[in-house]
């Protein structure tokens, strides 16, 4: 695989708190020579979520490059970034962000409808994913009718319906008990495949130990790779 599949160069990000400038990420550099499942660890406030948001093109860095398939995404136009989020990039949040008045199958299919506009195909894909995630009996359930673990499985299914090459997960098990955490981790690791990179921000040490690469952040810097 091309070594520049995903390459991060001198990525920095800061925020304003009144008159104070708070630097969250400082000249982050790393690359992926193989498709991996990667964990981002570190204390709260170390920059994990900020880094994922930058990589998912949900925010812009102050400086630096995000090179994907030999192209610097930071310089991409907004329309191109939107297309990338539809086709190649997906993110799963701790709070799942499901649409409350849509059923499980509708939440998942909507992500694909935004891409191909073929309603029948989108719903067939969503149904297939629900079965793969053990949710065939929850297809027409709304988020409030499902457990936290079930909601998170729906969120992951929604994220992968367009077969993204980059999948980011921001504390995907942070609100779950041990049983549901194990279920979600099992599904995330099943998503490892050729031409897909999965990066998971987590405080879960057991999860981090199972990933191919562990990056530890502290005070906006990568302080350890293992």
Placement of each model-derived feature along the sequence:
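Conserved ABC transporter NBD signature motif
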Residues: 64-72
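Conserved ABC ATPase signature
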Residues: 142-152
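Catalytic Walker B motif of ABC-type/P-loop ATPase nucleotide-binding domains
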Residues: 167-170
